[in-house]
């Protein structure tokens, strides 16, 4: 099933836009409103599973926290394992970490060292692509463990914030269901 224009418009309309959140001048795209609609949520998962069902994916990685909400059901639909990437000190087993830049400062992500095996074909899933910094750090973690990442999937792409171009420079093909301007 290829996504139809009607299906994509339905998904787009299920995402609420909140002006001046979290600070003045920001138009926040609230994917939690999509989660509140079981038809929209199910459709978003079905479309991602359909796109990647024959891609040879062996693991799906989701980034904290909303990436878990989409990545885990996509992994189930593909019949593969799900691997969470989390903020520091949230995973109980041995981890490796990757630091990445924020607008003001840095942050860090971690993954279990035994979660990805050399040669795993990994799909990264998150709710939203903006500047691409979080996903770039996630991809670095996966590659450090020997995993192969060629694709990342998103519900929303804030297309004018440069994330897709940033990830393409890392050899990542980005796919999103709903494009929005970031400003």
Curated annotation (Swiss-Prot):
**Keyword set for this entry?**
Cytoplasm, Glycosyltransferase, Purine salvage, Transferase
What are the EC numbers?
A: 2.4.2.7
Underlying gene: apt
GO molecular function annotations of the record: adenine phosphoribosyltransferase activity
Q: Under which main EC class is this enzyme filed?
A: transferase
- Record text on subunit structure and interactions: Homodimer.
Q: What are the recorded Gene Ontology BP terms?
A: adenine salvage; AMP salvage; purine ribonucleoside salvage
Q: What is this protein called?
A: Adenine phosphoribosyltransferase
Q: Which Pfam families match?
A: Pribosyltran (PF00156)
UniProt xrefs under HAMAP family: Aden_phosphoribosyltr
> In what pathway does it function?
Purine metabolism; AMP biosynthesis via salvage pathway; AMP from adenine: step 1/1
Could you tell me which SUPFAM superfamilies the record lists for this protein? PRTase-like (SSF53271)
The entry assigns this protein to a family as follows: Belongs to the purine/pyrimidine phosphoribosyltransferase family.
Subcellular location as annotated: Cytoplasm
Q: Which GO terms describe its cellular component?
A: cytosol
| InterPro entries recorded | Ade_phspho_trans, Adenine_PRTase, PRibTrfase_dom, PRTase-like
The UniProt catalytic activity note for this protein reads: AMP + diphosphate = 5-phospho-alpha-D-ribose 1-diphosphate + adenine
